């Protein structure tokens, strides 16, 4: 038994995902996933806003193999704060098949950054979703960005669409490649031609260093249908958004499962059916190759490209 009690109502990851009908291209990368603990080995951070179920590296890599991915990018989960040990352990245990994205504080030493790099970390995540993290001053984040730029790392940013105007100047001043999580969480009820989503497309159009993950339809969808019970046309309301980004910026998009799907309230998707969502947003083999192989390899394994 874990020493940690899960947040009431917590949804555990889907235990027996289906085998995807969509065959992933060889070398496909799950470019956004997490590990949680296990809490008895890697305790959750005291300042966390939620307490998850355990989701171990072994379970993550079993899912990788089941779905047909070759590699993973393991993103530091907010429940671990700036204690990157669980993520680093997952990367080190992957036989070179995983890279990491860390959360760091201003106090981190150059030697500690180098240790993260040697473990496979290639980016840091700045989270602006207020319900998930406490505020960090922007000057501190900019200082961190300047330091990690020297290692060739990038910055991953997580924010809500409504906050893009106030964050614009900060984001556009970052000295690295910038990767947006989940298309900046658009409100899909406003439609793909909304002013809100137009601003996000402008952000990408005007800044060639900005990439986007076209992931997490299960978080963004309002009308579904859900990726459950064999549903092959899940999350129709999200498709136009992701497809627009993939087709306009084919060389700057990534995709990931977001396993084990932290903080979902409505339902827990079947990860096999999430993979079957991909051809709806990247309809050609060429777009699928860029989204799933070429782009993540260029960003995370450039030495192999």
Swiss-Prot record:
A biological process from GO: 3,4-dihydroxybenzoate catabolic process
Binding residues for substrate: 32-34, 50, 78, 125, 131, 158, 182, 263
Main function: Involved in the degradation of aromatic compounds via the protocatechuate 4,5-cleavage pathway. Catalyzes the hydrolysis of 2-pyrone-4,6-dicarboxylate (PDC) to oxalomesaconate (OMA). Also catalyzes the reverse reaction.
Enzyme class: hydrolase
Disrupted gene: phenotype observed: Disruption of this gene results in a strain unable to grow on protocatechuate and a variety of aromatic substrates funnelled through this compound (m- and p-hydroxybenzoate, p-sulfobenzoate, phthalate, isophthalate, terephthalate, vanillate, isovanillate and veratrate). Growth on benzoate and o-aminobenzoate (anthranilate) is not affected in the mutant strain, indicating that these substrates are metabolized via a different lower pathway.
InterPro entries: Amidohydro-rel, Aro_Compnd_Degr_Hydrolases, GLI/LigI, Metal_Hydrolase
Induction: Induced by 4-hydroxybenzoate.
Cross-referenced Pfam families: Amidohydro_2
Gene3D superfamilies tied to this protein: Metal-dependent hydrolases (3.20.20.140)
Record field: pH dependence: Optimum pH is 8.4-8.8 for the hydrolysis of 2-pyrone-4,6-dicarboxylate.
Gene transcribed to yield this protein: pmdD
Active site: 258 (proton acceptor)
Protein keywords: Aromatic hydrocarbons catabolism, Hydrolase
GO terms assigned for molecular function: 2-pyrone-4,6-dicarboxylate lactonase activity
Activation/inhibition comment: Strongly inhibited by 1 mM Zn(2+), Cu(2+), Mn(2+) and Co(2+) ions. Also inhibited by 5,5'-dithiobis(2-nitrobenzoic acid) (Ellman reagent) in vitro.
Protein name: 2-pyrone-4,6-dicarbaxylate hydrolase
Species in which this protein is naturally found: Comamonas testosteroni
Enzyme Commission number: 3.1.1.57
Keyword Hydrolase among record annotations: yes
Family: Belongs to the metallo-dependent hydrolases superfamily. PDC hydrolase family.
Catalytic activity: 2-oxo-2H-pyran-4,6-dicarboxylate + H2O = (1E)-4-oxobut-1-ene-1,2,4-tricarboxylate + H(+)
